Amino acid sequence: MTQNTAWKNVKQSIACLRRNNLLDFEALHRLSESELALLIRSSGYYNQKARKLKAFCEHLQTRWQGDLSLFLSQETGPLRKELLQIYGIGPETADSILLYAAFQPSFVVDTYTCRIFHRHGWVAEDIGYDELRDYFMDCLEPDVEYFQEYHALLVRAGHLYCRRKPFCDFCPLNGWTEG
């Protein structure tokens, strides 16, 4: 639900699901796509997001009998591969699920990561997701808490300073450029 929206909107959608006792897999799985869409309306693109959430629920039910813990307990490589085969889950979402739900070391690359690293001259502007992810995975120790903190700090710096119109003079990374 976090794609293309502010976190405050996602929080409203989650609160709505919680108020309706729908933060449980069985309840969410039983809910129709249209009912789910109405409940997550505040997160934007709610019809597409409902379709994607329902696709995930259907996959989890069909392949794992609804056992999220068992699904998430797979090794990193096979779990990432399976996640990427589910409708609506791309690399960033797969890596977010691995890092924050399965607690497995998989570095999340997002718009802020690309923007910060490009503006500082550390990577090419046209670097692809997998190439930048591989760079982090090769250079950093595979530690879940470290990856979570690193990602959170990049998101914070991106949100506060490295926007489309940047605030470079105030950025804590100011001066840390290639060359």
What are these regions (language model features)?
Residues 2-179:
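Catalytic cores of DNA base-excision repair glycosylases
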